[in-house]
Amino acid sequence: MSIFNSQKEYGILAKLFHWITFVILIAQIPFGFYLVGLEFSDRRIDLENIHILIGITVFYITLFRLIWKFFNSSPTVGNSFFKGQILIAKANHFFLYLSIFTITISGILKKLYMGEKLNFIFFKYGFNKDNFVLADAFYEVHIYANYLLITLVALHILAVIVHHIFFKDKILKKIL
């Protein structure tokens, strides 16, 4: 299997970006909802730091994925797709990427505006002044962007199932 995409399927690197992101998000989203229910404590702060580190990892995987996509064309879609399907797929992908970036950035800004430090590997980052109004606003953005991401992932999976079962095209095989 080639590292680069071909006309028939995605290359190994694109597949790894896709499936690693999927697996991490399947764990990260419920983890985030679990954190919401925890009382404030040292344990919660430790778990939030893990959550943030995972989120930053997804951010960078997505960034590298987009850079790779820019320099490496996607497989052809074939003649069975009409323009509306292609437009919907492109919009879904665009908003998937946008929601991932929005979730990460808003989560980090929420934490920093709460006056907390962001522990990233061996460094601590923070703002000199807290702003609880902005922290609440970024928290709301973080939550709603997660709901958007969940919806988009569900639509993405549904579209793949429909294509695989009803249209019997090879769209799923391209990414496996």
Go through each PLM region and give its residues.
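Membrane-embedded alpha-helical bundles that constitute the cytochrome b-like, heme-associated redox core
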Residues: 1-176
